[in-house]
Amino acid sequence: MRRAAPAVDNRPREVNLMRKLRFFAAAAVALSLCVSTPSFAQARKDFKVCWTIYAGWMPWGYAKTQGIMSKWAKKYGINVDVVQLNDYIESINQYTAGKFDGCAMTNMDALTIPASGGVDSTALIVSDYSNGNDGVLVKGSGKKVADLKGQPVNLVELSVSHYLLARALESVGMSERDIKTVNTSDADISGAFATPAVHNAVTWNPMLADLKAKPNVTEVFDSSRIPGEIMDMMVVNTRTLHDNPALGKALTGAWFEIMQLMHGTSPDSQAALTSMAKASGTDLAGYKSQLSTTALFYTPQQALDFATSPNMPKIMTRVAQFSFDHGLLGKGAPNAGAVGMAFDNNVTVGNKNNLKLRFDPTYVRLAAQGKL
């Protein structure tokens, strides 16, 4: 599942412990790479990327099963294995530990796990942003965000659900001091909200769609109110990408071939969507409903325009501040700019001597120019 923090049974200290362990493990990996990598890296032939089930990432599975990924990899003389994992955070952990060359993840998680752990990472493709896929729910009719004041709110702490809640509170002049968060895993959120004791929750689709369809429930805020702030991306190890540009070309080419197919109206397009729906555990109507709140960039130009927007550094600065305020950039982080980020046109945010997250549109630009 997308954007799920570890299940910790309402014990936030364990969340922090897990993130600290990930931080030190990633730092160790980064250090080992620094001391053992030769000056002249030899081009590789075999690569692995991973993904987990989420509406906007189903194309990666389709790329594998239909041979589209293999076709593009063969074009550039390499092999790319696209591996589905069952646990979202575990997929990022494995990428951070060097077991995968790339991984599908959100912008906030890219910053707070691999990048803050010292693994230089590149957002190869910003594939979509949440446009209603994440929401804040309150039991009762006609409720508003202000009704959360003094109330417990169930959510996956330190995830983008937490970020969404903070933005919702901010929109009405409130802050997290006005509520109490109750850490609840994504697997438990639906069951918890069904009990009389739980009145408020923040979650994402498909759980969100199921819960807000229940009687006497109000969605008081959703991610369409903060367009572009919750991004879904394919993140690749920067050193690996630098040494093996064929990987970037193959992944990008395969992705946008599928985007073109999904956006069409032909029988082949419907068959592709039906296949993705089945793989995600729903039917075609259900999958299309999830896609309706996912702002997918169906063309390379759309993705390029978003990735090169002057708003990108502003959005990530806000995300970094939230991450720092919640201790997600590591214990020794002095400020929200501890982890440097690079954007198009040589724009940087944060520590320029510690650039660990890069929004590099090079390969999407090649796709937009028809050069892949």
What are these regions (language model features)?
Residues 1-17:
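Short, Lys/Arg-enriched N-terminal segments with co-localized hydrophobic residues
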Residues 16-25:
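Bacterial N-terminal signal peptides that target proteins for export
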Residues 26-35:
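Bacterial N-terminal signal peptides
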Residues 35-41:
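Sec/Tat signal peptide C-region and signal peptidase I cleavage site
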Residues 42-183, 190, 199-205, 228, ...:
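Short, glycine-/small- and polar/acidic-enriched structural segments
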Residues 188-284:
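Pocket-lining segment of extracytoplasmic ligand-binding domains
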Residues 242-333:
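Secondary-structure end/capping motifs
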Residues 319-372:
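Conserved C-terminal helix/tail region of periplasmic/extracytoplasmic solute-binding proteins
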